[in-house]
């Protein structure tokens, strides 16, 4: 059983320290595609967190019964099943957002964060720590997604969660939206700035020169 300090570490380290996007540079593709609006970024965060947490939990529960030779296949089967469940829940209760997310919910199965935590942590750890590790990494992923989405939606549309913050010129206001920030390449540059900022703050994360 994990003690409180270990549980806190499992939840907070991926968010504040070893962030899966900012430091490990994993899961970047979906971060580029679903961050033009806060709503889609938030729902994607919930989806990835749920899949990562529960896949870690279930894989940890059956880890001693999985033959080593087929462990990757078993992990993918668990993850794929959870992705299908999440996709169906979104279609049932948040159909409009599900349409906006399009194929990217289904592509959670290919997200390196989900597979990486299953292989590196859940296969070697007890169920509760594995579950918390999944939540922590999902929240770390979401922290970057929501940061990028905040910048893109406010500067690109003048809104945040659909609420107008910057009055647009078209509506008699003063702000001229930057359409470039609504395009996926803008997310690439914002994530690059986040990675640069994190590694500047923590020089230990900078790769050693050859």
Curated annotation (Swiss-Prot):
Biological processes annotated in GO: sodium ion transport
Catalytic activity: a ubiquinone + n Na(+)(in) + NADH + H(+) = a ubiquinol + n Na(+)(out) + NAD(+)
Disulfide bonds: none
Topological type in the membrane: Multi-pass membrane protein
UniProt key word Electron transport: no
Secretion signal span: none
GO molecular function: oxidoreductase activity, acting on NAD(P)H, quinone or similar compound as acceptor
Location(s), subcellular: Cell inner membrane
Enzyme nomenclature, EC number: 7.2.1.1
One Pfam entry name: Rnf-Nqr
Domain of life: Bacteria
GO CC annotation terms, alphabetical: plasma membrane
Transmembrane residue ranges: 42-62, 72-92, 103-123, 131-151, 178-198
Cell membrane is among the record's keywords: yes
Enzyme class: translocase
Keywords tagged on the record: Cell inner membrane, Cell membrane, Ion transport, Membrane, NAD, Sodium, Sodium transport, Translocase, Transmembrane, Transmembrane helix, Transport, Ubiquinone
Function: NQR complex catalyzes the reduction of ubiquinone-1 to ubiquinol by two successive reactions, coupled with the transport of Na(+) ions from the cytoplasm to the periplasm. NqrA to NqrE are probably involved in the second step, the conversion of ubisemiquinone to ubiquinol.
Assembly: Composed of six subunits; NqrA, NqrB, NqrC, NqrD, NqrE and NqrF.
Membership in a protein family: Belongs to the NqrDE/RnfAE family.
The protein's name: Na(+)-translocating NADH-quinone reductase subunit D
Lineage of the organism: Bacteria, Pseudomonadati, Pseudomonadota, Gammaproteobacteria, Aeromonadales
């Amino acid at each position: 059983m994990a003690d409180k300090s270990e549980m806190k570490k499992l939840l907070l380290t991926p968010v504040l320290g070893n962030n899966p996007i900012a430091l490990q540079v994993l899961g970047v593709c979906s971060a580029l595609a679903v961050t033009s609006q806060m709503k889609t970024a938030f729902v994607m965060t919930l989806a990835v967190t749920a899949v990562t947490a529960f896949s870690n939990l279930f894989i940890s529960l059956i880890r001693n019964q999985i033959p080593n030779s087929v462990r990757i296949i078993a992990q993918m089967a668990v993850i794929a099943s959870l992705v299908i469940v999440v996709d169906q829940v979104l279609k049932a209760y948040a159909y409009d957002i599900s349409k906006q997310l399009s194929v990217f919910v289904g592509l959670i199965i290919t997200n390196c964060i989900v597979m990486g935590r299953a292989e590196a942590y859940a296969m070697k750890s007890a169920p509760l720590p594995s579950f918390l590790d999944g939540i922590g990494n999902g929240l770390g992923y979401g922290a970057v997604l929501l940061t990028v989405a905040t910048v893109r939606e406010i500067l690109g549309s003048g809104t945040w969660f659909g609420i107008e913050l910057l009055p647009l010129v078209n509506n008699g206001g003063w702000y001229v939206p930057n359409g470039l920030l609504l395009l996926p390449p803008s997310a690439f540059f914002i994530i690059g700035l986040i990675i640069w900022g994190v590694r500047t703050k923590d020089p230990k994360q900078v790769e050693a020169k050859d």
